[in-house]
């Protein structure tokens, strides 16, 4: 018996998802399936299309697994477009006139990019951003261009702008509307997005109507209605999409007034045997331009063909994504257009975070919201909206930082109904995930495999994990609290192992109590524990591979790969000569200078190779390191106290100096801040610090476990009218007990709140020595105090360590991408305009350095011709990758931590903690190409690097 024929026109993301849904229902056995694909590539991931410019190949973007078509007997016709539909004859004709019969016809023709019909839109140098072929043309043009302009400031336009930036172009975005992402964001969110994108060096031009595009001697020029103009070398149109409905029109199918193939709840067109799904389909006068609704249409249509009940009833258009490195989320009625609705907004200007929620008139339901700069609340808020969950009495608490005594605002997954949609891309509910866990799926890999949750855009990953862990706990399965895959221990247990067994190195610890090579979680944690216990020099060969970039170079890394320098100024005291020396150094090295809230001076913009020279001059002027880079004591802030102030009752400055010099260099689970006030007027703000001291007529009041920041907490009064010796003894005990028992990266405030008994328990333990360990804690602190060393002074006296402070092991040239401009009389970051791709050496192999020049289990920067690369020494192997950290403009990958993930050697980038495989430069999770990888060989102790990237060599072969 001859099978009926199902023809699918269009093989994009939605089209392929339809095929997968058909296969899962065995429809490939009921139908002969023929697929027409206009492009030369089978379906690929358009969501991550920009990664193509980061070195990801067309093959890695493909959505087609292995021999999918052969295995399931589906016929794929690549580079074949359908020219017409003959509904009476039930055939489609391709561009060559060949006819293919169909019994069911599915149109998944997608959309095409909208190009405004302005004069000059078709000039050479004008492109659209839609397909891999489009991207190849853009890349070819960008190789000889300096500046690129994108017309369109929506989702697609900002994606295209990101692509141009990755190609090294000076990038501008032109938008007709007053705001970027005008559909998704309100005015406040759009303003914050614009501010953040502008800081990245992207020019933003809103309210610009392009009247013409002309060619001149310099290239292209856009002329605007307001009389202004903008010159460019190339232009990319990414101003939205239009449904690809021409085929349906020619076949006499019903289409919308503004385009789109009209469909019903079963995705049927005006001809019941012709179906339409995805961006070409118009459902209730609405075109869905996101992949998740298209997937839902595809799944619904396949289910209907298989005889299952159900219908397509619309889809949530909420979205969460990262645009040019900026987290953005929009859901529901983001613009607040519902009659009578109320909105709450919160802005954190310094951190460039904007949050807004819209609630119903009665304040009972969440209707929508906008998040820019921090989208961490997206999953919680979206579930509350989709499931109609009751709002708290004060809805604003959902977006405000948690205050003292308030409960966490995160929504417990136990409160979600089983039908709550967790993954919109694949329509996976909470119940689906719980069922998968009950069926034996006990980790994220198994959940993804069984349900496909978190395999689409990935935005639901955190919530999927929460549901999985909830169900595991419900089944009585212990959810491990191991710090990472390398150590089945908590931080407290690791501290105990190190202290009791006198373990002095990471290698000793992992050999006895762990496995593998470590990661960005356990290495810095163990480094901190070792320093708290033994206080050895951090750059000893055994300790260097554990240090994050700030501790490895004793400075705070900034967004452009330079560092900030903070000399210690105990209690804020500084001599006139000291001030003059700091000013002269800042001027000599062109450093941006700023007074900090901790009463110190911060100098920004020091290149890696400049740090030793800067610190040599600071040391000669009497300064030592301020430990602004470490999880350690930062500052002890003070007022002038009784020395100068008429209200002061004690010498607060003198005590602050004593405390700062006592605890400087103390490593802890998190940073420690202190303050001393000379009277109850509290000018030093001691009650907002980890350790706060306020003078009284009889002595000192001690306050503990406060902090400022995003979640401020008022410190608790711990003891009153203490003499100085008792005060210091109490602080010694409390800090060492905190170091012993706190979790990883846990501030003192959270630590105390999690202690059973809270501050009362601490008083008994510290003041009354209820556990009998007071003297032991004091002795541990005494050893730390006695073993203090200024890390910079030690480094300056060690030529071998100084050799690590260089940007390139084989060149003394500075990083050309670090540029400065003057603003308010001071040096500031300036965008770097790349002049095409850096030149590679003409010879196949270039000698870079001696093997011993690369630290064991660490990396160092180098130059391959003019290209910046990172060399990593992992055991007996040497690897070479591009030095540019993905998603940044900083050549800093060489300063990342080395480790492994499931035995796979990886580097963890220093700025944004991205896990990248050393062998091929791909992302550890997902396999997307992150950076280029280069061949390496070691001969006679010399490291050589090849001039043809590994990916290109592999594809050529």
Swiss-Prot record:
| Enzyme class name | oxidoreductase
| GO molecular function annotation | 2 iron, 2 sulfur cluster binding; 4 iron, 4 sulfur cluster binding; flavin adenine dinucleotide binding; heme binding; metal ion binding; NADP binding; nitrite reductase NADH activity
Q: Which residues bind [2Fe-2S] cluster?
A: 423, 425, 457, 460
Could you tell me the EC number(s) of this protein?
1.7.1.4
- Co-factor(s): siroheme; [2Fe-2S] cluster; [4Fe-4S] cluster; FAD
Q: In which pathway does it act?
A: Nitrogen metabolism; nitrate reduction (assimilation)
Q: Where does [4Fe-4S] cluster bind?
A: 639, 645, 679, 683
Keyword check for Phosphoprotein, yes or no.
no
Summarize where siroheme binds, as residue positions. 683
Q: Which reaction does it catalyse?
A: NH4(+) + 3 NADP(+) + 2 H2O = nitrite + 3 NADPH + 5 H(+); NH4(+) + 3 NAD(+) + 2 H2O = nitrite + 3 NADH + 5 H(+)
Q: Does the keyword Coiled coil apply?
A: no
- Binding residue positions for NAD(+): 193-225
Highest taxon listed in the record's lineage: Bacteria
Q: Which InterPro entries match?
A: BFD-like_2Fe2S-bd_dom, BFD-like_2Fe2S-bd_dom_sf, FAD/NAD-bd_sf, FAD/NAD-binding_dom, FAD/NAD-linked_Rdtase_dimer_sf, NasD-like, NiRdtase/SiRdtase_haem-b_fer, Nit/Sulf_reduc_fer-like_dom_sf
Q: Which CDD domains match?
A: NirB_Fer2_BFD-like_2, Rieske_NirD
Q: Where does FAD bind?
A: 44-79
Any single GO BP term:
nitrate assimilation
What family does this chain come from, according to its entry? Belongs to the nitrite and sulfite reductase 4Fe-4S domain family.
Q: Which NCBIfam families match?
A: nirD_assim_sml (TIGR02378), nitri_red_nirB (TIGR02374), PRK14989.1 (NF011565)
How is the subunit organization of this protein annotated in UniProt? Homodimer which associates with NirD.
Q: Write down what this protein is called.
A: Nitrite reductase [NAD(P)H] large subunit
What high-level taxonomic lineage is stated for the organism? Bacteria, Pseudomonadati, Pseudomonadota, Gammaproteobacteria, Enterobacterales
The encoding gene: nasB
